[in-house]
Every structure is written in C-alpha cells, then in structure tokens.
Amino acid sequence: MGTFCSVVKFENLQELKRLCHWGPIIALGVIAICSAMAMIDSVLWYWPLHTTGGSVNFIMLINWTVMILYNYFNAMFVGPGFVPLGWKPENSQDSVYLQYCKVCQAYKAPRSHHCRKCNRCVMKMDHHCPWINNCCGYQNHASFTLFLLLAPLGCIHAAFIFVMTMYTQLYNRLSFGWNTVKIDMSAARRDPLPIIPFGLAAFAATLFALGLALGTTIAVGMLFFIQMKIILRNKTSIESWIEEKAKDRIQYYQLDEVFVFPYDMGSRWKNFKQVFTWSGVPEGDGLDWPIREGCHQYSLTIEQLKQKADKRVRSVRYKVIEDYSGTCCPLNRGIKTFFTSPCTEEPRIRLQKGEFILATRGLRYWLYGDKILDDSVLEGVSRIRGWFPRNCVEKCPCDAETDQAPEGEKKNR
C-alpha cells in the first residue's frame, strides 16, 4: 500500500471530486451492497461467527472488500500519469516525429494521447473508464487490472453465500401439496432460532444482491480478459486501432512497406513485467519505452503522422446549410437520422448556418469532422470536432468535383 500512500497526498485531495460521477457511485454502490449482504447473510443465517468456518469465511469477505476497494481507489486517484505540460523531447530534432497538442501546449510523447474528458495528454492511454472516472494508462494499469480480477472473485464468493443462505433458509420452509408448493416465511424452523428471522425482506435483498454479484462477475470478468490480452501483447486498444489503420493504409495505396508494432517485446512474460512489478510501480517513466529489435522510439508516432496526413487528403469540406443544436438524437432532422444516431461517447457539435466543416469519416445519415475556425479564434482553442447530421450540410463545390468520400462512409452505406 506504500505506492498508494506516497502518491495520494493531502494536496491531491481535490481528486475526491472524481467520486461525484455516476460511474463511481454505481460501482461503489454495487460493492457496498454485495459486501454488506454477504456479511449479514453469513453471520445471521448461514455461517455463524462462533464456528471456525464462519470466522474464516467472514475474514475472507472482509479481505475481498479491502483489496477490491484498495485497487479501485488506487486506479482512480493515482491515475494514468499525464505528459507534463509544455513537454518537449530532449533532442529538439526529434520533434518532427511527434504530434503537437495545442491544448496541453506540448508534444505528444510516444504512446500518449489526449483525453477529452481529462483534458490532458495521457501516458500510454488505453481508454477513459467511466467506472473510475479516470483514464486507464501507464501508472494505474496494474491497479485497474487487479480490480477487474478481484471484483469477480469476490462476487463469486458472495454469490455462493447468497445461494447457500437462501437454500438453507427455505429448505425447511417448503411444504408440498398435490398441486402446489408453499413457502412459510413467517419463522425459521431451526434450533436455535436466529436473532433476526429470515423474512420476505431479507429474501428479496439477498436475491437482489445475488443478481448484482452474478452480473458483475460476467461483465467485469470479460473486461479483465480484455485487459490481460492488452497487457500480454503490450498493445493498448488505441494502438491496436492504429495498427489496423496502418495495414489498411499500406494496402489501399499498395505500398512496399511493412508496419511492425515496436512495443511488443516478443515475450508475453516481458510484456507482463512492464505492468506488474514487485514494487507496484510500472517500469520506465511513461515517456521512453523499450522497443523490439528493428524498430526505434518513434516508429509508432511516425505511422500516426502518416495516417494524419492521409486523413487530411481524404477529408471533404462541407458548408453548414441548416442549424443543428448538438443534441444526441434530433427529432427535427428526420426519423432515419434519429434512429441511426452513432452509438459512441464521441460528442456531437453544434452547427450554425454558414460555418464550414472538414469531414473525415461518416455514416449514411451522419458525418464526423472538425469545425474550420478562423485564425483569430484558433490560437489556444482546442479542436471542435464531433458528429452532426448529414442533411445539415452540403459539399463545397471545390470538393464536390473530387467526389472523395469520407473515411468509413462507403463501408457503412
């Protein structure tokens, strides 16, 4: 626990505001309900503390809760690690291999990406997780993955307690008739009688907690296997997408080149050790990374620059012909536009008649692009980009001649 205490200090207490979000509220609520009900069921109705097995079981339940909460808060409050504001590579000549972030006023270090929610460039960013209200990245990847492992294991233990409690409490209350089965919930037929009878309210609460435990085991368990796949390959979700686009770019232009992902060390054990260490602190500093033979530190960033240049070539300029409020599912834009709204966390952008948009990808009834801002407004302002209805814009005449479809548009028609 030394890592947690050394990073989360008094001056970082402003991070407590991360708890004021629907994700942590739901996550902590599920943990509290499952833990509390498992302990109550064990002590009162299933495995009393005066028995050896009951004591061991109770200690294990407390242990699960402590370890789950420790790794959860570690992932939330320690965070992924952010690229320092104004960061530049040690060798100024290397800046040509890096993208520049206008919001952070810094170059994007290898493997880092800008998060719109955190409003910072994140080291080795995998994704922004709403359940911890923070990004998963370089510093908290191990804690986040351990939380994904411990939560299902603890829920499996709790689910066992719930099932056995309901079974033992209901078994002697069942009465079978010729055509009916009745359950007497008035009192327990057990000697000695429990301090609090297992009534209808207790049964409903236990059944509800069982549903939460089983749902958490399945959902969070799947996320754990996804994260382990990422760790063993040393390739984040974003980097997998970059690699896929690299192959598409090479195939589209029929180039005589091969993209090799530079951070997979060729050994799952070596990849694993970069995230999980005995000290609890991941290897490296989050800015410079070990690379495989035949690659160099900027192999991935150079590919990103190529993809960015290719996206600019493929982008299409549109003019806004009708205002759009930026709502997720606009009813006034037509029934098809309403029902085909993109299912993504990416934002919608407000449009005003006369503005210009540079579209980079699209669906049949929606487009995604950047607003073209004036030079007087552009400096110091982050890019305004997102989804908008296709029927709010028209293609500019100069781009209509090329008839170049935005990326992804043909595939989604």
From Swiss-Prot:
Residues 1-24, 79-143, 216-413 are cytoplasmic. It holds the Pfam family DHHC. The active site is at C129 (s-palmitoyl cysteine intermediate). Its main location: endoplasmic reticulum. It is found in: Endoplasmic reticulum membrane. GO terms for molecular function: palmitoyltransferase activity; protein-cysteine S-palmitoyltransferase activity; protein-cysteine S-stearoyltransferase activity. The keyword Ribonucleoprotein does not apply. One of its GO terms (cellular component) is endoplasmic reticulum. A motif (Di-lysine motif) lies at residues 410-413. Its EC number is 2.3.1.225, 2.3.1.-. The chain crosses the membrane at residues 25-45, 58-78, 144-164, 195-215. A lipid is attached at C328, C329, C343 (S-palmitoyl cysteine). GO terms for biological process: positive regulation of mitochondrial fusion; protein palmitoylation; protein stearoylation; protein targeting to membrane. Palmitoylated at 3 different sites by ZDHHC16. The combination of the different palmitoylation events strongly affects the quaternary assembly of ZDHHC6, its localization, stability and function. Palmitoylation at Cys-328 accelerates the turnover of ZDHHC6. Depalmitoylated by LYPLA2. Residues 46-57, 165-194 are lumenal. It catalyses: L-cysteinyl-[protein] + hexadecanoyl-CoA = S-hexadecanoyl-L-cysteinyl-[protein] + CoA; L-cysteinyl-[protein] + octadecanoyl-CoA = S-octadecanoyl-L-cysteinyl-[protein] + CoA. Residues 99-149 form the DHHC domain. Keywords: Acyltransferase, Endoplasmic reticulum, Lipoprotein, Membrane, Palmitate, SH3 domain, Transferase, Transmembrane, Transmembrane helix. Residues 313-398 form the SH3 domain. It is a multi-pass membrane protein. Homooligomerizes. Interacts with SELENOK. The DHHC domain is required for palmitoyltransferase activity. Endoplasmic reticulum palmitoyl acyltransferase that mediates palmitoylation of proteins such as AMFR, CALX, ITPR1 and TFRC. Palmitoylates calnexin (CALX), which is required for its association with the ribosome-translocon complex and efficient folding of glycosylated proteins. Mediates palmitoylation of AMFR, promoting AMFR distribution to the peripheral endoplasmic reticulum. Together with SELENOK, palmitoylates ITPR1 in immune cells, leading to regulate ITPR1 stability and function. Belongs to the DHHC palmitoyltransferase family. This is Palmitoyltransferase ZDHHC6. It comes from Bos taurus (Bovine).
